[in-house]
Design a protein with these regions (language model features):
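Membrane-embedded alpha-helical core segments of multi-pass
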Residues: 20, 63, 88-95, 104-105, ...
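Hydrophobic alpha-helical segments and their helix-loop junctions in multi-pass secondary transporters
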Residues: 24-31, 134-137, 141, 145-162, ...
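Helix-loop-helix junctions that connect adjacent transmembrane helices in secondary transporters/permeases
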Residues: 67-173, 257-355
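Loop-to-helix junctions at membrane interfaces in multi-pass transport proteins
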Residues: 2-6, 40-49, 66-80, 113, ...
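Transmembrane alpha-helical segments in integral membrane proteins
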Residues: 22-25, 238-254, 327-336
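Membrane-interface "cap" regions at the ends of multi-pass membrane proteins
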Residues: 1-64, 171-174, 187, 193
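Alpha-helical transmembrane segments
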Residues: 9-18, 82-89, 231-240
């Protein structure tokens, strides 16, 4: 396996990262792993576990690529999807979470089944499994494979397989608790490295004023005219709520950390913490794309904006750290999806099939 951008120091940082990650996973696995303790972490998650876990599930590699690409092509307007999400995250905290936790369910199909019958539960269980397989696992593994392939000279399927094995290791080892605890460590690392990338980029451009002069003026507009082909303001205001309620309030992969909260208060605090973390999406993920346009206007593929910034601005050692961060985002998203998938399959399909035998 040949690494295109990695030096000895980069490899050392990568190895150290995985050793720490494995230690956290083993520690979390020392807890009981039966029934709800495996899938819902024994209802022991505190607000910071919930907040970082939800944000980590959302901040996958596809989002990193897409956010930097959007910043490169259109500026901060795509940040509406991050900042507007606060409304629906609050909706989860104050409307949905009390009902979910009050009913003491393990999955959202189970919650709907209690209200509307077993047929509804069965339909939603299979729908949830298909959704996780396609929109979470397949797309995340593909995006992760693209990123890993840029660094290692290995086929796409091998990249995806490696990521799947690493994520499955933590999910099977300690269940949701292992995923949640490693998410705290991984997301703090992601914030620090992404902030360093933005700061170094601004310095290379020559400061904030130089950056604003180097890109089109409308790159700093949060709303664009309704005849804009990329981001008209009306669909953002009226269309996003439909997707926002589904994604933040009813998607099993996103909501599962809330179901595992130690109490309703912890669940609500953690959910609100996620909303505050979403504010960071613009400076950490979209801004590097804008900086990339200022530094590398000749770049043909906007999807390469993030890795272009990394490989051109960071010294030896930092590239390995960034790769560790990208792996962190991958492991976080895939691990959460695998845990949600196994929870729904076990609780809503397998267990019920045994009852009816």
């Amino acid at each position: 396996m040949h690494a295109k951008f990695l030096d000895t120091l980069d490899w050392g940082i990568l190895i150290a990262y995985f050793l720490i990650l494995i230690a956290i996973g083993i520690w979390a696995s020392s807890k009981r792993k039966k029934g709800s303790s495996l899938f819902l972490a024994e209802h022991s998650l505190r607000w910071h576990h919930i907040g970082f876990s939800m944000w980590g599930t959302n901040v996958g590699p596809s989002m990193l690529i897409a956010s930097a690409s959007a910043g490169f092509t259109t500026g901060i307007v795509s940040g509406n999807y991050a900042w507007y999400a606060f409304v629906f995250i609050c909706l989860l905290a104050f409307v949905f979470a009390p009902r979910y936790l009050g009913s003491r369910v393990s999955t959202l199909p189970e919650f709907m089944g209690k209200r509307f019958g077993q047929s509804t539960r069965n339909i939603l269980a299979w729908y949830t499994i298909v959704t996780i397989l396609i929109s979470w696992l397949a797309l995340t593994l593909f995006a992760g494979g693209v990123l890993i392939r840029q660094v290692f000279d290995i086929p796409m399927w091998q990249s995806a397989l490696i990521l799947l094995i690493i994520s499955a290791f933590f999910t099977m080892l300690g269940g949701l608790k292992a995923v949640a605890y490693t998410n705290v460590y991984q997301m703090i690392l992601l914030i620090l490295v992404s902030a360093a990338l933005a700061i170094v980029g601004i310095y290379k451009v020559g400061g904030i004023s130089a950056l604003t002069d180097a890109v089109p003026a409308d790159f700093w507009n949060l709303f664009r005219p309704n005849d804009d082909t990329a981001f008209p303001w009306l669909p953002i205001i009226l269309g996003y709520p439909v997707m926002g309620v589904w994604f933040w309030c009813t998607d099993q992969s996103m909501v599962q950390p809330v179901l595992a909260a130690k109490s309703l208060k912890e669940g609500q605090l953690g959910t609100n913490f996620t909303g505050w973390l979403k504010i960071l999406d613009v400076p950490l993920y979209i801004l590097p794309g804008i900086i990339c346009l200022a530094l590398f206007p000749q770049l043909e593929n906007p999807d390469e904006a993030y890795m272009t910034m990394v490989t051109h601005l960071f010294p030896v050692g930092m590239v390995g750290l960034v790769l560790a961060v990208l792996t962190a985002a991958l492991v976080s998203t895939i691990g959460s999806a695998l845990n949600a998938l196994s929870t729904v399959f076990t609780m809503d399909i397998y267990v019920l099939s045994l009852i009816h035998i």
